[in-house]
């Protein structure tokens, strides 16, 4: 098994290295690709030094079985055919192909089998906020069809990249030192603040991030579910949180929901209000599962249920999900 990582120097690329090692992913060879800026850099993987190759239109992907790509939508679109022309399965972390009809959009806990139908040799990784939400929604959907979802996200600074996380650190330092605050990666100062905008606004008043949650959820779950999202950047460092309200076709009790979440693949139930036990990003950065808590019946709709989830957006929201897709393909001997 020969594996490639495209965009290895970024936050998700680095997480790919960690996840592949942690999970003892089966491979005989790992090749790394990057831009002119990162080409020539070396990374250690399983005791070996691997030099980053310059990504270019040549035959470097000949013999590659699986290519994990996380170098941005533009790069993915430009290099799709170069990466796949010799048969490599391209598992792409960007937004480039997610809504293409001939590209499966996969969260293994929800729709793993979709990965088997990939006419272009490409499988898309969903947006981080969508991934953790649909893992939780799957548990409820198995009890009763979900008709409507209202979700508010609380997205950590690192979701905007490593430089954004560094800027948040610096902003806190500047505020506490009574210095002018540097604002480059966000629309406004994030330290001691919330910003109710992630990505650009569309004509309907929702941001692109919010519309991703609508469109991607319906594609992944093969569902007519209606999703209304509000995405907010918060001054946490890592791990995204979401407050989710669902309306199901029949009433779901808290006990039923808790049992479903406890048994749900990729989920950890952390719901003990009496002991103040509930998921928080401070304690869940770097963890694999999606954590669920604050489960309660809606007071205005007998078919409504409300809960709170937290997941690491770089791990399950990106690298881990992609690696799990590859593991599934290996398991069913489809790569």
Per-range role (PLM):
Residues 1-190, 226, 290-291, 295-300, ...:
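N-terminal Rossmann-like NAD(P) cofactor-binding subdomain of oxidoreductases
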Residues 67, 157-335:
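Charged docking surfaces used in two-component/phosphorelay signaling
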């Amino acid at each position: 098994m020969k594996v490639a990582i495209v965009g290895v120097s970024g936050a998700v690329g680095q997480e790919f290295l960690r996840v592949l090692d942690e999970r003892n992913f089966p491979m005989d060879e790992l090749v790394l690709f990057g831009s002119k800026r990162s080409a020539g850099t070396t990374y250690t993987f399983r005791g070996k030094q691997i030099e980053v190759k310059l990504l270019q239109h040549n035959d470097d992907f000949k013999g590659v079985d699986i290519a994990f790509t996380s170098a941005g939508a533009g790069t993915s679109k430009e290099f799709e055919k170069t990466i796949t022309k010799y048969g490599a399965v391209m598992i792409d972390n960007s937004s480039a192909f997610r809504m293409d009809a001939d590209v499966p959009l996969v969260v293994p806990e929800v729709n793993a089998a979709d990965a088997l139908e990939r006419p272009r040799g490409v499988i898309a990784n969903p947006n981080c906020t969508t991934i953790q939400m649909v893992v939780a929604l799957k548990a409820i959907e198995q009890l009763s069809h979900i008709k409507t979802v209202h979700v508010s996200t609380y997205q950590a600074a690192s979701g905007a990249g490593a430089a954004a996380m560094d800027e948040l650190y610096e902003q806190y330092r500047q505020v506490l030192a009574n210095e002018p605050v540097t604002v480059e990666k966000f629309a406004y100062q994030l330290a001691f603040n919330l910003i109710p905008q992630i990505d650009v606004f569309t004509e309907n008043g929702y941001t692109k991030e919010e519309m991703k949650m609508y469109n991607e959820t319906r594609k992944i779950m093969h569902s007519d579910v209606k999703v209304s999202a509000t995405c907010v950047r918060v001054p946490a460092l890592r791990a995204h949180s979401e407050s989710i309200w669902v309306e199901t076709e029949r009433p779901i009790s808290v006990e039923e929901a808790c049992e479903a979440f406890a048994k749900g693949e990729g989920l950890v139930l952390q719901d003990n209000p009496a002991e103040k036990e509930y998921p928080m990003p401070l304690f869940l950065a770097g963890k694999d599962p999606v954590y669920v808590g604050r489960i309660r019946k809606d007071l205005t709709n007998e078919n409504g249920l409300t809960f709170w989830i937290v997941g690491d957006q770089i791990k399950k929201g990106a690298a881990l999900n992609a690696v799990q897709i590859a593991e599934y393909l290996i398991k069913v001997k489809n790569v």
